[in-house]
């Protein structure tokens, strides 16, 4: 609106100057409509002012140098001004003209970004692998590698009823060889070769556990059979109980020796010694007691 007001004021001033200069042949002036009957000079001025106003609004105060000439004297000045205005608008609308090289991406920067993305992906994969390893470590071990299972007394007795004791086993024998030797008796669940806990050497005997009790009775037929050049001893396994030896098969081992035997040995050794019996003999209703000598 300011540009239109300035154009109107300029046109009024030009008109007054033309009237003052003489409006006829006597005045010596020139009619503004003689050389330019269409008033194109004024139109060129108007277009130039309008173009300047639009430039200031679009570019924010920037004015392209060398494009102000609107062609005041020629008849094609107005059309030239419009063409320049359209060209300038097209140039302003093209992206990246004002920013220059800033819109062009740096290949080195792209390579760095790609490397960072690869490192992040590798870190994610390593984290997943670590989580899987932790899960596997927290899981219970497989049955084949499990440690000794604590069994109840009933379970132990039931397993012992399906097991046999094999004595006089060669020290170089393996569990596979023993399993092959008793394979015809039935399905073998487990073969245990006892070793010394200090030296790690075999003790010379083993235990074989079968799937059923019938296999135990069948395996007794291999008693005194030859295994690796030795005559082995095969007997049913017994549950370990207090006071029963695990090596002396079938012969219980008392915790304490009888005092009578020790006394008798001493009596034989010392002829004048008479042992004192532990029992008492009651006779009738008498309160008095008397010691007796069994020998």
From Swiss-Prot:
Annotated Gly residues bias: 19-31, 71-81
CDD domains: RRM_II_PABPN1 (cd12550)
GO molecular function, one term: poly(A) binding
Ranges annotated as biased composition (Acidic residues): 83-96
One family name in Pfam for this protein: RRM_1
Chain intervals for the UniProt region annotation (Disordered): 1-102
Keywords: Coiled coil, Cytoplasm, mRNA processing, Nucleus, RNA-binding
Compartmental location: Nucleus; Cytoplasm
Source taxon at top rank: Eukaryota
Claim: RNA-binding is one of the keywords in the record: yes
Stretches of the chain forming a coiled coil according to its record: 106-140
Annotated stretches, region: Necessary for homooligomerization: 145-295
GO cellular component annotations of the record: cytoplasm; nuclear inclusion body; nucleus; ribonucleoprotein complex
Matching SMART domains: RRM (SM00360)
Biological-process GO terms, alphabetical: cellular response to lipopolysaccharide; MAPK cascade; mRNA 3'-end processing; positive regulation of polynucleotide adenylyltransferase activity
Domain RRM intervals: 162-239
InterPro entries (alphabetical): Nucleotide-bd_a/b_plait_sf (IPR012677), RBD_domain_sf (IPR035979), RRM_dom (IPR000504)
Domain statement: The RRM domain is essential for specific adenine bases recognition in the poly(A) tail but not sufficient for poly(A) binding.
Biological role stated in the UniProt entry: Involved in the 3'-end formation of mRNA precursors (pre-mRNA) by the addition of a poly(A) tail of 200-250 nt to the upstream cleavage product. Stimulates poly(A) polymerase (PAPOLA) conferring processivity on the poly(A) tail elongation reaction and also controls the poly(A) tail length. Increases the affinity of poly(A) polymerase for RNA. Binds to poly(A) and to poly(G) with high affinity. May protect the poly(A) tail from degradation.
Complex formation: Monomer and homooligomer. Binds RNA as a monomer and oligomerizes when bound to poly(A).
Record-given protein name: Polyadenylate-binding protein 2-B
Protein source organism: Xenopus laevis (African clawed frog)
């Amino acid at each position: 609106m300011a540009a239109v007001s300035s154009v109107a004021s300029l046109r009024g001033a030009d008109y007054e100057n033309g009237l003052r200069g003489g409006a006829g042949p006597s005045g010596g002036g020139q009619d503004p409509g003689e050389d330019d009957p269409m008033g194109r000079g004024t139109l060129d001025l108007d277009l130039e002012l309008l173009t300047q106003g639009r430039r200031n609004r679009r570019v924010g105060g920037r004015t392209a140098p060398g494009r102000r000439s609107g062609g005041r004297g020629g008849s094609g000045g107005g059309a030239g001004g419009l063409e320049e205005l359209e060209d300038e608008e097209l140039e302003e609308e093209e992206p990246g003209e004002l920013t220059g090289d800033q819109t062009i991406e740096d290949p080195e920067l792209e390579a760095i970004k790609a490397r960072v993305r690869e490192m992040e992906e590798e870190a994610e994969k390593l984290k997943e692998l670590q989580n899987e390893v932790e899960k596997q470590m927290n899981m219970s071990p497989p049955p084949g590698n499990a440690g000794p299972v604590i069994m109840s007394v009933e379970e132990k007795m039931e397993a012992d009823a399906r097991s046999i004791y094999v004595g006089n086993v060669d020290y170089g024998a393996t569990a596979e060889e023993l399993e092959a030797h008793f394979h015809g008796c039935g399905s073998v669940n487990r073969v245990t070769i006892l070793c010394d806990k200090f030296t790690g050497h075999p003790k010379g005997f083993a235990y074989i556990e079968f799937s059923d009790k019938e296999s135990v009775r069948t395996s007794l037929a291999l008693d005194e059979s030859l295994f690796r050049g030795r005559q082995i001893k095969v007997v049913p396994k017994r549950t370990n109980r207090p006071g029963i030896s695990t090596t002396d098969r079938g012969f219980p081992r008392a915790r304490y020796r009888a005092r009578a035997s020790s006394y008798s040995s001493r009596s034989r050794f010392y002829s004048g010694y008479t042992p004192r019996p532990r029992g008492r003999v009651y006779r009738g209703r008498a309160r008095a007691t008397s010691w007796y000598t069994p020998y």
